[in-house]
Amino acid sequence: MKGKLYIVSAPRFIFDGLTPGRQERIVYLPDFLSFPKTRFKQLTRALLVGRIHLPKKILYTWFQKEYLDQMLQAKAGDAILIYEGCNVNVLKAIRSLIPSGVTCHIYYCNPIHTTFKNPSEDLKKIQRLGYELSTFDPKDAERYNIKFANQYFRYPAEDIPEEPTSDCFFCGLAKNRIHELQALKELLETNALTCNFIIPETAKEGISYAEYLKQLSLSRCVIDINQSNQTGLTRRPLEALFYNKKLITNNADIRRYNFYNQKIYLFLG
């Protein structure tokens, strides 16, 4: 890609290691397309956005002017990448304002069934709007006829601490796996293993990725508990691989990867 890349709501740390030349072509935008906080904006957006044609000035009601204007500065040859875009009407309203010749991508880094109520129907609608869709999960890619884009990881430049301070490390939102995580933690501690489990209630309460990697590096083993019906790799197996850590995972699909080693990877079946 020779033009600019406008990235919406993606984790910034993934792109921080790019060369200055590539960084100059990236425009980072926060998740300004997310659900409004006030009841009035929630109701009016549900009733109007994407259902009738609305000019940009009206869309400012729901989407912050600064960021919408930035995204719509894209020109032919540029590209837009939206993480987890799932509201069909919002994507429809935005797409109608994007100049022709701008490629629009959406990347799903969570299982599709956790993102959509009607996955097949909604994904087809989004594709018909002109968005190119991809997912981290190979089964979802096959099931919904979208592109598969494997998991990614950027190895940081920071030094790795020498001595681990815990045996097992997990950090992530509970989602639908809190009972499984609690049971595993109790099992590990019963077997005299020290656990460092960080489970914030919301994403805003979580630690930074730099701190996350520091905590991971201070542990001997990484815990990887996937959501139900997930086959795509999370970033944890890659982090364990690059940091030379053991891994406990419930993702059976990991055994098909060439880096799988049964001596250091424990599958919870």
Where are these regions (language model features)?
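Nucleotide-sugar donor-binding catalytic core of glycosyltransferases
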Residues: M1-K75, Y83-A93, Y108-L238, K246-F259
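Conserved acidic donor-binding segment of nucleotide-sugar-dependent glycosyltransferases
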Residues: I264-G269
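A short helix->loop->beta-strand "cap" motif at the edges of active sites that frequently abuts
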Residues: P99-C104, Y131, Y243-K245
